[in-house]
Regions:
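Secreted/periplasmic carbohydrate-active enzymes, especially glycoside hydrolases
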Residues: 1-316
Length: 316
């Protein structure tokens, strides 16, 4: 069993939430949202029933807090620690042990905060304070009136949040909030994998997977460096496990890997959906540092735009 120098501790601990300023706390589920937690705790009705939408909308005039306690260890010499939020919706402040470590303003990205020297041995308290999205867009609209969809709420164009939440000609006004993706504590002594991009080239009887792997140095997770493009001791290997259990491995920082006689993925109703498991393992001077695993389907997509009596078969 490989031991990686990058440790990823999921904060799937017991969370609680409440309306900011309210003494009553409720059990929360993370990942989740304010609406799903209020529904689960009997604090709101189904927003899609009758005119409950309007009462659900009023709830988002308020601020909400989420809190959890987790067991941590202090960073050792040479280690860096980061809190990673894979999805926060949307305007919020982050506190670790009552110290503000950052704020967010965009639900369409991942957020990471350096907490080296801030994580204690033993119990740590993590708190996320969500500001009302309705108050945010109201203030932004008053400063700069800008319109979007006629059926959406004024000011929605000023916030980096799923715009469908603010209403559409077909949609309800339900601007939810919350920690909608996982939270992790990262501890590392070296860099870690930042991204893996896989391209597929299909030929008769085979598929070639082409890899682009980038890493983050431990000092700055915002910086991306292609693995294998610098003489810094970083390499990676790729392992692909076929649906039948066959394993293909390519070492020494491969740019591509060939799968012979592939099992192709087809849309529902057209064929089967076999998945291949791809694992990229990064090492520094031969020591495993980090790994990345995903399941992918081998497929291509083209648009049928042959001429027809109206122009082309695909409307675009």
């Amino acid at each position: 069993m490989e031991v990686f120098t990058t440790k990823k501790q999921p904060l799937t601990t017991v969370w609680k939430m409440h309306t900011a300023g309210d003494a009553q706390w409720y059990p929360a589920q993370v990942p989740g949202t304010v609406y799903t937690d209020l529904l689960r705790n009997g604090q709101m009705e189904d927003p899609f029933w009758k005119d409950n939408e309007y009462r659900a909308l009023d709830l988002m005039e308020k601020d909400y807090e989420y809190e959890t306690a987790f067991e941590g260890t202090e960073a050792q010499e040479g280690e860096r620690q980061w809190l990673r939020f894979e999805g926060l919706d949307t305007i919020c402040d982050i506190y670790l042990n009552e110290e503000k470590i950052g704020n967010t303003y965009n639900m369409h990205r991942t957020w990471e905060f350096d907490v080296t020297g801030k994580v204690k041995a033993g119990e740590n308290i993590l708190r996320v304070y969500f500001h009302s999205p309705l108050e945010y867009i109201k203030e932004a609209y008053e400063k700069q009136p800008t319109h979007g969809s006629e059926d959406a709420m004024d000011g929605f164009v000023h916030i980096r949040k799923a715009h469908c939440m603010f209403g559409w000609d077909w949609g309800a006004h339900l601007p939810d909030a919350g920690i909608f993706r996982p939270v992790y504590l990262l501890t590392m002594t070296e860099g870690r994998i930042d991204s893996v991009y896989i391209r597929q080239e299909h030929e008769e009887g085979k598929v070639t997977l082409k890899f682009e792997v980038s890493r983050n140095p431990k000092e700055d997770l915002r910086k991306e460096i292609p693995v294998g493009k610098e003489a810094d001791g970083y390499t990676y290997e790729v392992t692909v496990t076929a649906p039948d259990g066959t394993v293909i491995t390519a070492k020494d920082t491969p740019e591509d890997l060939v799968i012979e006689q592939p099992e192709l993925w087809w849309p529902n109703g057209v064929g089967a959906q076999p998945l291949y498991e791809v694992t990229v393992t990064m090492a520094k001077d031969g020591q495993p540092v980090d790994s990345w695993t995903r399941k992918i389907g081998l497929r291509t997509m083209t648009m049928d735009i042959h001429p027809d009596e109206w122009g082309e078969s695909f409307a675009h």
